[in-house]
Regions:
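Intrinsically disordered, low-complexity segments enriched in serine/proline and basic residues
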Residues: 14, 18, 24-32
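N-terminal "arm"/small-domain region of PLP-dependent enzymes with the aminotransferase-like
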Residues: 34-93
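Conserved PLP-enzyme active-site core in the AAT-like
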Residues: 42-49, 68-69, 90, 118-336
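Conserved C-terminal alpha-helix-loop-beta "cap" of PLP-dependent enzymes
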Residues: 324-489
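Charge-dense polyanion-binding interfaces
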Residues: 486-502
Length: 502
């Protein structure tokens, strides 16, 4: 069989014959959806997708594995705050009991259910530990919601950049020494905000970073959205609560069997103003929280509490076998780092005759394997306890088969190191200005941005309002635009709105 991609024709060798799967693919393809002309509902599309044999190497963590979850959701239990069913915003009954169970499982002092995703947890945490105009130390590879909190509270960010691993092409961990240096140089910093693990699975030394923050008598907030499974098996790192973080945010839906949009915020025994964090949770979360989503979190916690070892042990066995098999790749390469979340599978295409976007298309179109993300020189596959042995073997064998059809090729590496920028004004100051104009990318160099620009996923800003646009920023944007990626956040294509300081 021959797969024709945008840049290259790849002959797929092996004994795969035409199957019903391939025939169904011809009549059902995500790319053929026409939302404007179709009368189908979102549910209709979801129903059709559920009947196909597409297997998801991506979140959410339940992986549509209904057999694992011993319950039936959702319409019959989709209620509101009626008698005996408690209230998320003033929990003192069944919701409080459920949150206390989650706190015990995660070794936290206090846990709150989030039905607006990790985003609302990050916003509430940052705004809860800072006051207007405060300084905050922020890892530059944090999610865009961190930058939105900075804007909302008119904060002055001090950035710490992650290491860049030239060998793997990944933005690495945040160095403890860098954080120590910046805290010593900026004594007015009121909090530290990092992301660990990153979208790619890189883990920072949260324990030592927490110790440094506490020496300076300030709290550490950890966006551990992608590490909701941490601490439940020795194959994975301890979670950030166990490592001394003051506030931790988990996206339960990303790597555990819970519905999309579900998350947790944990607060630990520190000097954090808990009332203020709770106040922002009440302000920013929906006043009509979904009981289906809350039930999903609670069912997930109960499953881990009662059957944690039963579900994690075979899952870890499958992961170890996968990594062993993928170590046999000749041209594609399974990326490994010293501090890594082994539930993630980063497959590098460096020095092969195929691009990451080509690989993603082959996996999707021929093998019906949908990846989580394509970025730079690699594709990212996410696994979770909801994965089946058969699904993971299918992913492994597809990569091995594709690998046999490839050859070596020296090619220009795709640059992923975050460009360094200079903060000239607070984002809140710039975004409140009315005077601005749109410039072409090249013309904008040296000017101050009034817009965010980022690739999504993972949602890490390349440029933030108030930062000076550099040649490196524009080179970064141009490279990804030429590779076919969508640059989000910019109002006008290939232009940036800049501040006119008159």
């Amino acid at each position: 069989m021959v797969i024709i991609t945008e840049n290259i024709t790849v002959s797929i060798m092996g004994n795969m014959k035409s199957t019903d799967r391939e025939k169904r693919a011809a009549s059902w393809d995500v790319a053929h959806f026409n939302w404007e002309k179709s009368m189908k509902t979102i549910y209709n599309y979801l129903e059709e997708y559920s009947e196909s044999d597409f297997y998801g190497m991506h979140m959410p963590g339940h992986k549509r594995n209904q057999k694992m979850m011993e319950n039936d959701l959702p319409y019959e239990i989709d209620i509101t705050e009626i008698d005996e069913f408690d209230d998320l915003h003033h929990a003192d009954g069944i919701i409080r009991e459920a949150q206390e169970r989650a706190a015990r499982l995660y070794c936290a002092d206090e846990t709150h259910f989030l039905v607006n995703g990790s985003t609302v947890g990050i916003l509430s945490a940052i705004m809860g530990v800072t006051d207007k105009q405060d300084q905050i130390l922020v890892a530059r590879n944090c999610h865009k919601s961190v930058y939105h909190a900075i804007y909302l509270n008119e904060l002055k960010p001090v950035y710490v950049y992650p290491e860049y691993d030239e060998k793997t092409g990944l933005n690495g961990e945040v160095r403890v020494d860098d954080i120590t240096l910046l805290l010593d140089k900026n004594p007015n910093i009121k909090a530290v905000m990092i992301v660990s693990p990153t979208y790619d699975g890189v883990v920072s030394d949260v324990k030592k970073i927490a110790e440094v923050a506490h020496v300076h008598k300030i709290p550490l907030i950890v966006d551990e959205a992608h590490g909701a499974h941490f601490g439940f098996h020795p194959y994975f790192p301890k979670n950030a609560n166990e490592n001394g973080a003051d506030i931790v945010i988990h996206s339960v839906h990303k790597t555990l069997p819970s519905l999309t949009q579900t998350a947790l915020l944990h607060i630990n025994e520190t000097s954090v103003n808990r009332e203020k964090v709770r106040m922002y949770l009440h302000m920013l979360q929906s006043s009509s929280p979904s009981y289906v989503l809350m039930a999903s979190i609670d069912e997930c916690m109960e499953l881990i509490e009662k059957k944690g070892e039963d579900i994690f042990s075979p899952y870890v066995d499958n992961l170890q076998k996968m990594r062993e098999e993928l170590g046999k790749l000749s041209y594609l390469r399974l990326v490994e780092t010293s501090h890594y979340d082994c539930s993630k599978f980063v497959i590098s295409v460096r020095n092969t005759n195929i691009s990451s976007r080509d690989l993603e298309k082959i996996l999707r179109r021929k093998y019906h394997l949908q990846m989580e993300m394509t970025s730079g020189d690699y594709v990212l596959g996410m696994t979770a306890v909801g994965d089946t042995k058969e699904g993971l073997e299918r992913f492994t064998q597809a990569l091995l088969e594709i690998d046999r059809s490839l050859s070596a090729m020296n090619k220009q590496r795709v640059w992923r190191e975050l460009p360094r920028t200079r903060l000239c004004a607070k984002s809140s100051d710039v975004l409140h200005k009315k005077r601005g104009k749109f410039c072409g990318w090249k013309e904008s160099i040296g000017k101050i941005s009034m817009e965010y620009a980022y690739l999504y996923p993972p949602g890490i800003p390349i440029i933030v309002p108030g930062e000076q646009i550099t040649e490196d920023v524009i080179a970064y944007l141009e490279m990804y635009e030429q590779l076919g990626y969508s640059i989000e956040g910019l109002e006008v294509d290939k232009q940036i709105k800049v501040w006119i300081n008159e």
